[in-house]
Amino acid sequence: MDESVFYISEGDPADKHSQESFGHSSSVHSSQQHAGFRQADCPQNGACLSGVGTGERLFVASPNKALINVYSWGKESPDQRIPIPEQLSCLTLCKHPRIKVSEGRQSDERNLPSFRTPWLLAGGSKTGKIYVWELASGNLLCVKEAHYQAITAIKFSQCGTFLVSGSSDARCMVWRTSDLISVYNKDEESSINIKPFASFTDHSLPITDLAISEAGIISDLRLYTVSRDSTLRIYDIMTKSLLTTFVLPSGIECVTKDPANRACYVGLSNGLIRTVPLYQINPNTSVLESIGGRGKIVTLDTDPNLLSTFVHHQQRLSTEPLHKTLNKKTTTEEKPILVTRLSITMDGSNLISGDSAGRVYVSDIVSRQVVKTFAPCKSSISYIQVNACAAEKVSVSNTSSNNNDKRHRLIPQFKRVLANPDPLEHQLYMEIPKQQEDEEDFESWLARKSQEELEFRNLTHINSSVTVTGAAPTTNDSTVKELEEKLAKVSKAYTDLRGKHEELYEEHNRLLSDS
């Protein structure tokens, strides 16, 4: 098992060298580079990767054109340049919902078709509109004027129930996915007049980033939003309420959260990364308690001892790039370094961060020290994504399947007008993989049959199988032996008593007959 980090830069139209940008995918725990993508640059949050390995795709919004570039994993140049109605500023993907087919049987993610796509692609534009496409058909399912200014961040919840958008107008909107894709409803009026599930207007400056908790229960969904007004706000999506507001000493550019929801990590506009703990130990009761709640405002002071601060992004490079030196661009020395993107590994032990200078670091969260440095980009980092993957899945030799017929790699072109509401016109292009037969040995087959027989006999959903635990087998054997000896003695005494009774009864009958 390995973890792959994908990062991409923003690009600078004024600098011709920065246009020779690359998107990189490298290993966190080794020096292996998994993939590279040429001419890949995008605005902040303007890219999304469906996964790691053969058959996966990268979607990149062009920073200065109304195009979406689509890359296939293992291929450096873009496969498709898809025109869209207007220029997009951010992208996000929604995967297909997982449906449980049968009881006790789960789908095998290793048995994937060579042609596969996620379910939905959503994008936010600079005019404040939300676009939603279905990737398997290319249909445009939704065009919604959601904000007054440019949308800066857009994300689906892990379950796909909600779509959250943040904008420069300082508003954050939560939409139901089912409402946005209701183009096939018979009621056209309801599909046009879509209202947000929740609207949060507590920020006073543009929202720069947001994160959604990966909760197994929908009632536990939490929304984390950050803004240049130096606040981190935590909302409960289902109750539509503000839980906690954290005030930091500087503007916030990005946010990520711990996988176990123990803390948040925010990148500041002064080049620092602050840890925001969500739990603390009460010194009086020694009990772990949550911080904030019920709309409480928590102010985080400066950290002079650097107990919860990462400072490695404030260190400038000793030598500037050669092309900047030749062009005599000395103004870059005076610009402050911003932490633009943050992500975290699967176990929550390493923090991946990118800044406006194009540097990407892997830091240990406990020691707050840099453990690895990736190849730098020539402009600001605009997107970082961490994916867990198998080592053989991302090997270079495994990309030979990309040389198949090009028709099998291309996805349908995106429509520029809304889809036909007639469900009969809804056509999908999908590849159904061959059903993989399960291989089981004779012992597992016997165990499964015995369990089925037990359930059949019980005729109930309660499993009445009993597992004996407790005393050792030697103690049980001695107890049984002692009870057997007592039973033998009682049986012998009863036999003797019965014999005496029969002798006395015969003597009694003999005396009666003589008299």
Curated annotation (Swiss-Prot):
Compositional bias per record (Low complexity), positions renumbered to this chain: 20-34
SUPFAM superfamilies xrefs: WD40 repeat-like
Keyword Repeat applies: yes
Transmembrane annotation, as ranges: none
GO biological process annotation, one example: DNA-templated DNA replication
Gene3D superfamilies per record: YVTN repeat-like/Quinoprotein amine dehydrogenase
WD repeats: from-to residues: 104-143, 146-185, 202-245, 334-375
Chain intervals for the UniProt region annotation (Disordered): 1-36
GO CC terms, sorted: nuclear pre-replicative complex; rixosome complex
Cellular location(s): Nucleus
Keywords, sorted A to Z: Nucleus, Repeat, Ribosome biogenesis, rRNA processing, WD repeat
InterPro entries (alphabetical): WD40/YVTN_repeat-like_dom_sf, WD40_repeat_dom_sf, WD40_rpt, WDR18/Ipi3/RID3
Stored Pfam families: WD40
Annotated family: Belongs to the WD repeat IPI3/WDR18 family.
Role according to the record: Component of the RIX1 complex required for processing of ITS2 sequences from 35S pre-rRNA.
Oligomer status and interactors: Component of the RIX1 complex, composed of IPI1, RIX1/IPI2 and IPI3 in a 1:2:2 stoichiometry. The complex interacts (via RIX1) with MDN1 (via its hexameric AAA ATPase ring) and the pre-60S ribosome particles.
Protein name: Pre-rRNA-processing protein IPI3
Gene: IPI3
